[in-house]
Structures are given as C-alpha cells and as structure tokens.
Amino acid sequence: MIDIEETKKIIHELYNSLMKRDKTKAILDITDVLLQVYKKIDSEKYPEILINKLVNYIYIVGFDNKIHFLGNDEKLLIELGDISKKAGINSKYKANFTDKSQF
C-alpha cells in the first residue's frame, strides 16, 4: 500500500511547478491529468495503478512534446515513478498511455 497523503503532496507540488511554465497544450493536458488523479486517488482501490498510469502518461506526453523535466520537477516525477513501481509488472500493458480518458 502507498502513502496517499505523501503521494498527493508530490502531485500537488508537481502541479504547482508545471503551472508556472508556459501554458502549452501539453502542459495543460499534464496538469489536467494531475488534478484528476489528485481528486480521484482517495477513492481508488489500487492507487498505485493510477499513479503508474499517471507517470507513463506524463513521460509519453512530455517526450512527444519535448517537455523537459529538470531539477525539482524531475525529482518529483522520479518519486512518483518509485511509487508506481508498486503496481506490479503487468500494469504498464493495460492502458493507452496517451489517452486522458483513462483518468
């Protein structure tokens, strides 16, 4: 099981940091998904799977749109990645990474 409050704190911090950047469509998509996950994580039966989807989404959208996660943003994303590892090996094959509707 993951620490929901700590995870929400990381999501909140990453959201606030990204909102300080130029508001490109990709940044707005990522922050929208961060907000959806933040609101939904308390009621999830397996929140680590949701975090796994979130991290994959951020990496794929970031890569496709040449968004660089440096400094604290990189640290926060790595922390979320560490949390997402608790989802197990097969969770990454169960979703279309770029589809916002999975959140």
Residue ranges of each PLM-predicted region?
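Generic structural concept
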Residues: 8, 31, 35-38, 55-58, ...
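Surface-exposed polar/charged interaction patches
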Residues: 17, 21, 37-44, 60-64, ...
